[in-house]
Amino acid sequence: LIYQDNIDVLPKEKIYGIINNSVGNLRGKPSHSSELVSQTLLGTKVKILKKEGEWYLIQTPEDYISWIDHGGISIMDEENYKGYYKNQYIYSSIQGFAYNSIEKESVVSDLVVGSILNVTGTNGEFYKIEYPDKRIGWVSKKDISPIFNSNDFSGLEIVRNSKKFIGVPYLWGGTSSKGFDCSGFTKTVYLMNGLVIPRDASQQINEGKLVDDQRKWDNLREGDLMFFGYYKDGRRRIDHVSIWIGNGKFIQASKNVRINSVYPEDPLYDRYHMEKYIESRRIIGNETNGIKKL
């Protein structure tokens, strides 16, 4: 009730926002001490549901609802929101920086893979970018690329991108190359290829096409999602997800991003998760209602 007194319902022309930092930390409640429930990346368009003090309740493209502090978001009217991107690119290096000039005199901000950049110009080997809050930065051309058309990539591309993150630490709520949880990892890998999939493993399992629930590994293709969990009170509970990379192996964010095997005789065998294996699903070519193109 104390919080309720501070809630502002925003006028229609101010219900749009774009993430302004390399990583926007999303909280379960409007407080920095609240649990980190997820993250979203620079350039992501969000819908603002309400304002409470210096916090905004937002809805991300994958329909995840959470709180972000005012420093992580730029508020726009509908016209500027829809017309913000002149040329939309994605940051494709794992981590890096935008600079105030092509001479790299000082850093404007850090950048992480998956950041969506608004390219407004070019100079030699650099692109000029504009941030949602109107800051200007310069980024090396080799570090960014046009956003993929989701029809143009294969499971092998998913695997190639997933391996870039080997060794990245586990972070509950993490969806960036600074730290991942299991579903944040799978979500980010697919985002790199222009597909927005749901945030949590329990949501991701509802998308795509079922390809295996009998441990028949020959049914799987590179890039398929593997789901793990347990049954309680007759209900299925999904608590982990990984990516099949072929040859009996999968890649996952568990302790850190690492490769494991489905075969007990393999030194990389992950007994804990394999005892909880539920099923595998194929996203590529089977984009169901919960999957969106970037």
Residue map of PLM features:
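Aromatic- and glycine-rich peptidoglycan recognition patches
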Residues: 74-76, 82, 100, 104-106, ...
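Residue-level "contact hotspot" at macromolecular interaction interfaces
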Residues: 39, 110, 216-219
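Loop/turn positions that initiate beta-strands
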Residues: 43, 111-117, 223
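Boundary regions of SH3-family modules and the immediately adjacent low-complexity/disordered segments
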Residues: 1-15, 31, 52, 60-94, ...
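Catalytic cysteine-centered active-site loop
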Residues: 170-184, 188-222
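Second-shell loop/turn segments in exported
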Residues: 146-148, 169-177, 231
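Short alpha-helix capping/helix-loop boundary micro-motifs
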Residues: 30-35, 97-107, 206-216
